[in-house]
């Protein structure tokens, strides 16, 4: 009993104070430029309006630090008995498969301690898996193992409403014939990360969540983390929703215990996931070599790229390195994008499954926060676009053919169709090549509910031969 009292005094009280401080900061962070905040707010609100998703909780990292947290919409929809409850930053959402990067980090921590190597065969730690003496830990963390996915469906099957242990998942899916030869294909598979989580437990001798808490969550101050694999979120958190086809939103069913182990079990606030992003940017949990392994695109045996590292998607965003991942479990969809070299991250957590609102908001917000300046070609295209929305064009920019094209009728059509759209969320160049002695460029113009494609041809003297807009395919 004395030991318990000492623990309560020395651990729980400071932890409680940390919780209170963290929740307060999550609620009050607004250190972002007002104009930038307005753009992010507009993106989030318009995407929610267009998609019908009830709510989004957003956290923004700039210059390596959290500068903005905000929540939009309703965390709980109104019923006959209760009013709608607005979303607030303190509410937790399930982050789904974003959890995988925490599992990958646990493995890399164990490698740093000399307790395993990511090039070890999985059978060294978990005997009995199909071709476990050949498939490596690196291959399970990069989805190149060949182990069949136990949950490819985008809904909760009846069987998943009942408890299932990690060992039962491995016995059922980890002992099937591989879908392909290890290292020869990329195929997303939740089974891989159940295997990885079991390896963490086997090597450490402690529960997976305990290891993450001691080595990641507690050091980073991520005090809101919740194990959704063992218990559903509380009434103070966001309610998960889904719908059948175009029907009404309904409270989503909860997966049974065990199904999300190590592959999608974490829930937290957007603020706390942004704390994790701060650590990725600062490289504060792992050694530099481990982050290099995590962020490096894994290649197949034939040299083909996979756009995947270890537990993370690895993308090029207009010449900027993006480390990202989405997540979906019953009633929740999330997106976490980190422009790692720019010190920028966008966390978006939403409470409706099967809808891409989270990814749309994150992918629109991140480059805005990074402040990528428009190229001269983009700037010119944007200025012409704004003029066309007002029914005018600067003919000094146009070659004779294009000047002839923009008749009063054409200008009227451009104005009547583009003006109601207002300012686009983003406007950027996607392609450039030389053709017919001119420079061809393609641009993507993004609105919450639609995308447009602009194509131009420019002569060496700078005169425009084409400026055409059509719906993007």
Cite the ranges covered by each PLM segment.
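Short, surface-exposed loop or secondary-structure junction motifs
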Residues: 70, 74-76, 133-330, 335, ...
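Bacterial N-terminal signal peptides
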Residues: 11-22
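Short, conserved catalytic-motif segment at the N-terminal edge
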Residues: 29-93, 115-120, 175, 320
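Exposed beta-sheet edge and beta->alpha loop/turn motif
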Residues: 432-473
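Short, well-ordered beta-strand elements
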Residues: 324-325, 335-352, 454-455, 464-470
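Short, gly/Ser/Thr-rich active-site loops of penicillin-recognizing serine hydrolases
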Residues: 348-410, 472
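Short active-site loop at a secondary-structure junction
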Residues: 49-57, 79-140, 178-191, 261-264, ...
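Short solvent-exposed beta->alpha transition segments
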Residues: 392-437
